[in-house]
């Protein structure tokens, strides 16, 4: 990493269960980010076509009844609106990155065969798919929707911003998964999430300090009123996802955000000097590690 680069977290609400319309919205937002001079845009966890909230997914656990039947209809719609990789929607995302000459990182529901995966796709400014990572372990209700990820993408990619890598939501709480990125030299750490709690920010501050990297946490923002009317939502607040996106420095301080309860774009300038100074005292996979005693093996 060298110099100063501008990045963006795009806390936007998808057009729920409408893949094409959501990508249309993404395209407009990426154009705005590019016009502001940012070199990377990060979107929330499974932005395309929507994050599967427990407000309806809980009903998938039932064997019968009207709610279970309605939830299965919604699951079928989610499957039909998911992204295939490679495929036309992935190609369109790649073209959006190329047309705007930036790095585009977006969370998608990815369909592979008969299984949906929670995936992070990172496209390069030349329109290539540079990183394809599937969430290793779905959390709680998500196990009714997504399959288990694999070891692909547990690494960084070289970019003009520095080495970029990422983990999805609560996989960021898995120490070995984090260390996989540390030993790959991560400098810009992507953390798309659906966790809109205050506790999440304690984790992000810790990860920034532990990794000595810049951390971009982009969180789901979703209103109950934005769902199609036939989605069986359990009673609850209007905000299904309250956001809380933020960009953090290697010392755990905020460079931008948190942004709560609304759509918006966060920008921050990442200065490589901050990263280098932070690593004088601590480097988790370098001078403050003991590879002679402790070693991570990725299968």
Predicted regions: what is each one?
Residues 11-28:
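N-terminal phosphate-binding loop and adjacent alpha-helix
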Residues 2-9:
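Extreme N-terminal starter segment of soluble prokaryotic enzymes
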Residues 220-299:
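C-terminal beta-strand edge segments of enzyme domains
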Residues 84-85, 89-91, 95, 110-187, ...:
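Active-site catalytic loop in hydrolytic enzyme cores
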Residues 19, 31-125, 195-197, 201-213, ...:
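Cys-nucleophile CN-hydrolase/nitrilase-fold catalytic domain and related Cys-dependent amidase chemistry
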Residues 106-108, 119-122, 155, 245-247, ...:
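Short beta-strand scaffold segments in enzyme catalytic cores
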């Amino acid at each position: 990493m060298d110099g100063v680069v501008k990045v963006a977290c795009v806390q936007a609400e998808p057009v729920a269960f409408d893949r094409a319309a959501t990508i249309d919205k993404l395209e407009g937002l990426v154009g705005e980010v590019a016009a502001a001079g940012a070199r990377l845009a990060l979107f929330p966890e499974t932005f395309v076509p929507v994050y599967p909230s427990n407000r309806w997914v809980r009903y998938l656990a039932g064997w019968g009844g009207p709610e279970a039947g309605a939830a299965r209809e919604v699951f079928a719609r989610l499957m039909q609106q998911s992204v295939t990789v490679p495929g036309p929607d992935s190609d369109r995302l790649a073209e959006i990155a190329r047309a705007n000459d930036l790095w585009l990182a977006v969370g998608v529901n990815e369909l592979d065969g008969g299984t949906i995966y929670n995936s992070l796709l990172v496209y390069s400014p030349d329109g290539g798919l540079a990183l394809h990572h599937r969430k290793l372990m779905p959390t709680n209700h998500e196990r009714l929707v997504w399959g288990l990820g694999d070891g692909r993408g547990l690494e960084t990619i070289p970019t003009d911003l520095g080495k970029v890598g990422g983990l999805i939501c609560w996989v960021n709480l898995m120490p070995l998964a984090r260390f996989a990125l540390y030993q790959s030299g991560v400098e810009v750490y992507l953390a798309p999430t659906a966790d809109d709690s205050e506790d999440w920010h304690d984790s992000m501050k810790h990860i920034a300090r532990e990794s000595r990297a810049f951390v971009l946490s982009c969180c789901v923002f979703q209103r109950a009123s934005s769902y199609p009317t036939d989605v069986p939502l359990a009673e609850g607040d209007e905000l299904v996802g309250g956001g809380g996106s933020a960009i953090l420095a290697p010392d755990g301080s905020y460079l931008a955000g948190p942004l709560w309860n609304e759509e918006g774009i966060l920008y921050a300038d990442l200065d490589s000097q901050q990263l280098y100074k932070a690593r004088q005292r601590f480097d988790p996979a370098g001078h403050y590690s003991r590879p002679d005693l402790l070693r991570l093996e990725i299968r």
